[in-house]
Amino acid sequence: MTNNRGQHLSIPSSKPLVKDNIYVATLHSVGLSNYEDNKHVFTYEVVLHGQIYNIRRSIALEPSNNQISIVQWLKSHSNYSPSHTEYGPYIDHKHLILVGEYEGNYFVRDVAPLENLMEDEVNE
């Protein structure tokens, strides 16, 4: 007996993270860069196949014209509020992240709200 259900879907891989994929991630921490004084490092935690992956994104405190600012970066988070003056309210919240890869290292290419998307679906 054959059917065509799922015929065109890829079977999920048990491989580690894959670049250009979107994952649900928790913002684990924000700290100063060990390499550059003028950057904050956002560390997101992804749990995949029972393994924990920490993926980072560095954002410049004083961005150039072609760089994203910290305020712009935070606006993409699930619980963004202009009234937040510290990172504490963002920690432990879930977000969607797009993972990139550069020279064998993973990084967060982009972030999007997860909770607001789920609320919108419930309210429709």
Question: Model-predicted segments: where are they?
Answer:
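Short beta-rich binding modules
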Residues: 1-124
